[in-house]
Amino acid sequence: MIILETRGLKYTYPDGTVALQGINIEIKKGKKIAFVGQNGSGKSTLFLLLNGTLKPQEGEILFHGSPFKYDSKSLREIRKSVGIVFQNSDDQIFAPTVYQDVAFGPANLGYSKERIDASVQHALEHVGLTRLKDKPPHHLSGGQKKRVAIAGVMAMEPEVIILDEPLSNLDPVGADEIMDLLNEFNHFGSTIIISTHDVDLAYRWSDYVYLMSNSKLIGQGTPAEVFKEQELLKKAGLRQPTTLEIYHEIERRGLAYGKNSPKTIPELVNTLKPLDLMWVEVPPGVREGENLNIGVMYGEYATQSPYEAINATVLHIHPDGRAIVELKRKGIKAGGVLLYDMDSYSLPEVRQIIKDGEIVFVGAMGKQSKTLAEQDGIHLDVTSGVIDKSILMALCGKRCLILTSGGMVDHALNRTREYVEKSGIEFTVGVVNREGGCKWIEEIDENPGALKI
């Protein structure tokens, strides 16, 4: 279903600067969209048009199939449904307190006092700023200001959220927190549109990419389709995403198999060819054709399971005592990724899960989960890039626990299950404090009647 569409959009600023030339786009409902291009390519102007802040000189914009109208009442409805967060949060935040700033939009829409209060409280809780509601916004950090701006848009309950360079001037942890928020909004049905010149972000995050250069749309498609086109990227003044660049290099060297477009480090690792032959040192007296017990391999040497018991057949013995052997692998203990829904948080329960489950790696996603963990002295090994890092630890046979809440529980669960399904590498995945819970894979192997998550 197309939620937002433009036809032949053109815009020139009063000083003669041509910002947009003939832009035609179709945004599907519920998708994550990235507009990618260098500064000055027209992304910000397009966003101001999509929100009704600017009016096109030619062409039209349609929302749910109906053209934009520019009278006051129609514009109020457009801006309620299509919220925008500016690149510089200071351009958007002006009220004396955080609460008043977030309440500005709902108040302008004519909400009752009770509805305004409920909307603001919900938005602040969602972005983790409830305790700062009475603070002056100019005392906040860059990441906190960005979350205030997002809360102000969210309080109006828009169907589409547009963010112009959402990660500009944020440190890596702050950037991860903002992307966690956007993923959660999208999980609950919001269409998310961002602009960025960060090709790595656009490649790994978006469902669909529009490539812009010099006020024109020069390419569009899935991230895999757009970012494989070297000439198109060169024309836009951009480079290939790092993950894709590394994959193409290992593919060129014959170290990868299949035609893949890995977006994450775990997906990239999974493209590597399994080792079939290896040089090893052999004891004196071993002959060609004999079998050897190599022992257990893990990490980069285990290609099919996190830990593998290796037997080998000696194919050729070199005069220096080393031999080429053919490896025969058998997977042994796998790790896993458990999720704990912090909406049903109990400190004794979490501590018991960590103890009984022999958890060695704990991460938290979302401000609420991180705050609760820190307050109660739960040691966190990771607070950014939590899903990918937990998957990598599980591949090394480690048992991991992710503390999160709301829509991020299912988001993390689906991301991890998707990796297991695509890779064929099996490890435990599940939400530990939901009905039925989950069991470690090795426990299931010992009891085939047990439920497997």
From Swiss-Prot:
Stated role: Probably part of an ABC transporter complex. Responsible for energy coupling to the transport system.
Organism: Methanosarcina acetivorans (strain ATCC 35395 / DSM 2834 / JCM 12185 / C2A)
Binding site for ATP: G37, Q38, N39, G40, S41, G42, K43, S44
Top-level taxon: Archaea
Protein name stated in the entry: Putative ABC transporter ATP-binding protein MA_3551
Keywords assigned by UniProt, alphabetized: ATP-binding, Cell membrane, Membrane, Nucleotide-binding, Translocase, Transport
EC number: 7.-.-.-
Cellular component GO terms, alphabetical: ATP-binding cassette (ABC) transporter complex
